[in-house]
Curated annotation (Swiss-Prot):
Keyword Ribosomal protein: yes
SUPFAM superfamilies: Ribosomal protein S6
Protein name: Small ribosomal subunit protein bS6
GO biological process assignments: translation
Gene: rpsF
Family the entry assigns: Belongs to the bacterial ribosomal protein bS6 family.
Gene Ontology CC entries for this record: cytosolic small ribosomal subunit
Matching PANTHER family: MITOCHONDRIAL 28S RIBOSOMAL PROTEIN S6, SMALL RIBOSOMAL SUBUNIT PROTEIN BS6M
One protein family per Pfam: Ribosomal_S6
Source organism (scientific name): Bordetella pertussis (strain Tohama I / ATCC BAA-589 / NCTC 13251)
């Protein structure tokens, strides 16, 4: 089995259904003796260019280990799901264990927002 990094972009109106979609894709991979090594929900982010007149979309990254038949079925499900705007599959040499650069930036943004909220509540309490 080979290792792959799969990134897919979901329509922003379908953001509520992303967990169900991810669960379905995970079940597809693990059901055919594959493994999901890393799953990252990058959230709603700005697109580099408009896709179908949209400027924001929901990003999800999965690092998986599976066979070619499983990968073909996964790509087929991406292709025929209208909520998935784009997808990218990259073959990798091994499964990374550390968080990706994008996930680190998402965590930094969340920490920055949390500290700003804490500072705002502290000033409001004074």
């Amino acid at each position: 089995m080979r290792h792959y990094e799969v990134v897919f972009i979901v329509h922003p109106d379908q953001s509520e259904q992303v967990p169900a979609m991810v669960e379905r894709y995970q079940a597809l991979v693990t059901g055919q003796s594959g493994t999901v090594h890393r799953l990252e929900d990058w959230g709603r982010r700005q697109l580099a260019y408009p896709i179908q007149k949209l400027v924001k979309a929901h990003y999800v990254c999965m690092n998986i280990e599976c066979g070619q038949a499983t990968l073909d079925e996964l790509e087929h499900s991406f292709r025929y799901n209208d909520a998935v705007l784009r997808h990218l599959v990259i073959k990798t040499k091994k499964a990374p264990a550390a968080p990706s650069i994008m996930m680190k930036s998402v965590e930094r943004e969340e920490a920055r927002k949390a500290s700003a909220e804490a500072a705002a509540t502290a000033t409001a309490a004074e």
